[in-house]
């Protein structure tokens, strides 16, 4: 019998909902060994505060898994943390969780990582430039390009651009970037989703996919040449498709993933279908990383009302991706 994959789950911003959501991982049986990274006392206290006390055991790599306890790789807080109240002094603690999870993934200790939400603002206030998990992990693995993909509602939606002003999107979609984005998406669908010959639906940038150049020429000058080049190599790419009809069920049924050109072209449909249960996946990294699709929810922290659905879905997807990768030929 194959050993269960071991996943690192970072508990995120200590003032947010991450610690209590991680404690609720004990409510399910998982086809994996889950190791929560964080301050063990904080996680136990936050679970007790919301009326769900748990048993915590400090994680050791050589130790056998135990039932009914939450394994925590203890990383101490820099200063005490109260639910709902950010503390700049804990910014480095939050990044230490990521650093340890990443080191474990790169070194083979963990099969992947699942990240609870962090608060970008408080990290930046501490004097550390930080724009998000995705960029941080890319920088620390020397990965030149990563691709953001959301999974939920029966859809996989990747983005050619992410957090850019709409006015900057067109200039950011170049032939080299689009080509590499599609290569990454294709490769990870094969290697980490177990889809032997993925079919990718590619959105146009402009209304009606440019209407033959009358509503913009990006489809003619950038998108179509890239698709033609990659089709010649055997990739199954459909498009550029008008985004207003791409998400119709009969169109989605013929694809394994969608590549949208910008954030608000692709994600509103997916979040409408899966809000609270979606998963953010970073493609192109040398490690598996999934994340919840929500923020720190400081207003809910400590109340016991935070929904664990997205964290559960992120763990489920990370397990599936780890299993698919393990099946790939060495």
Curated annotation (Swiss-Prot):
Its EC number is 1.1.1.262. Substrate binds at residues 133-134, 271, 280, 289. InterPro entries: PdxA, PdxA_fam. It catalyses: 4-(phosphooxy)-L-threonine + NAD(+) = 3-amino-2-oxopropyl phosphate + CO2 + NADH. Pfam families: PdxA. GO terms for biological process: pyridoxal phosphate biosynthetic process; pyridoxine biosynthetic process. NCBIfam families: pdxA. PANTHER family: 4-HYDROXYTHREONINE-4-PHOSPHATE DEHYDROGENASE (PTHR30004:SF5). Catalyzes the NAD(P)-dependent oxidation of 4-(phosphooxy)-L-threonine (HTP) into 2-amino-3-oxo-4-(phosphooxy)butyric acid which spontaneously decarboxylates to form 3-amino-2-oxopropyl phosphate (AHAP). The active site is located at the dimer interface. This is 4-hydroxythreonine-4-phosphate dehydrogenase. It comes from Azoarcus sp. (strain BH72).
